């Protein structure tokens, strides 16, 4: 198995480390902060209504909207991680010096990761704990507005449209959460040998192949393909549904455009190239919409077999032929 035991994490330490650098928070007085939180909540509700009408889904998005700072985001991550680990039903490691060391090392790594991610993350829809909650990371949103000169009303609605679209994807396809969970379990339950992993790495050039191969590798590839579609679909909806409401939507998309070519982790592991997921998923959705209109995209949420494969993400016409005939 990729994981034989539930990960040991000292969450108190992890969250303390993730909170380091609170002085980096945008300088807002109490009154401005209160207005910001209220505005983001109202904007998120409006975004849910706009996206729901655009996608023809009888819902206004996530049940709960939480506006958080970086500390609040760390707490949310803990809840999501613990829920996923519980659902994997992995046993706990025996207590002892080795587990103590592992617990603290994991806390340092996770705390640093949460801290780095929270400074970039604008929002997140939690589809996996059953809480049906949309998080908006207020300090990161404000920092982007100031750094790039974005119009706050436009940028906040655009971000909220993307995240509410994720909520509506799971409304349109109630089976999607279980489908993703099953693929994740197949990956974590992999029994591939190191030799199989090295052979797969040599064949694919993807470092992720060292961790999983065979059927689990196929599950990971399939999962990455679907996540690519979901991110692209959320970007497409934010752009097109937002166009009548966001005067600067074209400028926002240009500012967030991902250039071709892998960068960072993507150079050694295409499976974890998040920038490629946004870029390729958006290109797929644009082409399908050009060929079949918005109803053509909705077909992906009818049943699991309609979800695009990784190969189809790169060849939207192939997906249209398979699903629409």
What kind of feature is each model-predicted range?
Residues 222-325:
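Pan-zinc metallopeptidase signature
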């Amino acid at each position: 198995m990729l994981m034989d035991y539930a990960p040991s994490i000292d969450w108190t330490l992890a969250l303390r480390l993730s909170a380091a650098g609170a002085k980096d928070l945008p300088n807002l007085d109490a009154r401005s902060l209160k207005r910001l939180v209220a505005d983001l909540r109202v904007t998120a509700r409006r975004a849910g209504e706009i996206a729901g009408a655009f996608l023809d889904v009888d819902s206004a998005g996530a049940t709960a909207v939480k506006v958080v700072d970086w500390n609040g985001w760390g707490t949310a991550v803990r809840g999501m991680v613990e829920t996923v680990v519980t659902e994997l039903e992995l046993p706990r490691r025996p207590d002892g010096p080795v587990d103590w060391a592992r617990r603290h090392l994991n806390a340092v790594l996770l705390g640093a990761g949460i801290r780095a991610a929270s400074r970039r993350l604008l929002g997140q829809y939690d589809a996996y704990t059953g809480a049906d909650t949309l998080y908006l990371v207020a300090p990161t949103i404000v920092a982007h507005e100031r750094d790039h000169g974005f119009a706050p009303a436009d940028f906040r609605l655009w971000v909220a449209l993307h995240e509410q679209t994720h909520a509506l994807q799971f409304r349109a396809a109630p089976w999607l959460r279980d489908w993703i969970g099953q693929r994740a379990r197949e990956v974590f339950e992999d029994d591939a040998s190191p030799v199989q992993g090295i052979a797969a790495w040599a064949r694919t050039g993807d470092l992720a192949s060292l961790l999983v191969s065979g059927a689990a590798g196929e599950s990971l590839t399939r999962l990455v393909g679907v996540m690519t579609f979901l991110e692209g679909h959320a970007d497409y909806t934010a752009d097109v549904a937002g166009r009548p409401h966001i005067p600067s939507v074209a400028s926002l998309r240009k500012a967030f455009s991902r250039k071709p070519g892998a960068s960072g982790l993507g150079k050694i592991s295409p499976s974890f190239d998040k920038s490629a997921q946004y870029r390729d998923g958006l290109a797929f959705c644009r082409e399908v919409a050009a060929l079949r209109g918005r109803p053509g995209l909705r077909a992906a949420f009818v049943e699991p077999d309609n979800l695009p494969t990784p190969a189809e993400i790169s060849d939207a016409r192939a997906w249209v032929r398979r699903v629409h005939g």
